[in-house]
């Protein structure tokens, strides 16, 4: 991983892999999620498929700069494109998870000429019950948020670990739980500024 300074003066932590001549795949994490969200095996598979891969940490994540003042998703999108401009002038592929998916979708409004594709994962619309019924969709179980908001990170990994692991086990469902991977990912949330793990609360 390395640090890159943007035109705006903000420094982001990034990792770029693969051959410079290959099409660029930009992996955009969700709010507060580190670039480690994108597992190395997934990155390797993309490289083997002919992509150059860019992973990065948003501000307030990893070793990227930390900010106490609030900001909008538009700021994150602008910084993402400043970063992309340093590596690729051709159209790129964006794959985003959660907030990262929204960043890709919003980019389609005024950056269509810079995009080869956009893939949004777990970035669905906000709908009321009537709209779910109209589309014949099943709404999220209300108890899901109840479990997740029980986790209130303090910025201290030792104190917070049990809450994170409870959340990961819940989200994992009935699939075999990879505790080693979950622990490594949780530790990645606390890299850099100790306030990073509270980014969802702060912003």
Segment roles from a protein language model:
Residues 90-133:
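Conserved hydrolase catalytic core segment
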Residues 139-203:
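Alpha/beta-hydrolase
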Residues 74-92:
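Conserved acidic catalytic loop of the alpha/beta-hydrolase fold
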Residues 1-4:
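A domain-start/cap signature at the N-terminus of enzymes
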Residues 118-154:
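Flexible "cap/lid" loop of the alpha/beta hydrolase fold
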Residues 6-66:
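Conserved HGGG/HGGXW glycine-rich cap/lid loop of the alpha/beta-hydrolase fold
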Residues 65-77:
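Catalytic nucleophile-loop/oxyanion-hole region of alpha/beta-hydrolase
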């Amino acid at each position: 991983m390395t640090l890159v300074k943007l035109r705006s003066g903000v420094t982001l932590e990034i990792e770029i892999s693969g051959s410079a001549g290959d099409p660029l795949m930009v992996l955009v994490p969700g709010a507060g999620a580190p670039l480690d969200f994108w597992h190395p095996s997934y990155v390797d598979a993309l490289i083997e498929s002919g992509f150059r891969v860019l992973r990065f940490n948003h501000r307030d994540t990893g070793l990227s700069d930390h900010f106490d003042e609030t900001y909008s998703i538009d700021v994150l999108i602008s910084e993402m494109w400043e970063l992309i401009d340093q590596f690729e002038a051709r159209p790129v592929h964006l794959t985003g998870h959660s907030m990262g998916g929204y960043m890709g979708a919003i980019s389609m409004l005024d950056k269509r000429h810079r995009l080869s594709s956009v893939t949004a994962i777990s970035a669905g619309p906000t709908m009321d019950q009537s709209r779910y019924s109209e589309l014949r969709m099943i709404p999220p179980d209300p108890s899901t948020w109840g479990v997740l908001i029980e986790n209130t990170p303090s910025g201290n990994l030792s104190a917070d670990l049990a809450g994170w692991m409870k959340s990961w086990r819940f989200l994992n469902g009935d699939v075999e739980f990879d505790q080693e991977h979950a622990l490594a990912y949780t530790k990645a949330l606390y890299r850099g500024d100790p306030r990073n793990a509270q980014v969802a609360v702060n912003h």
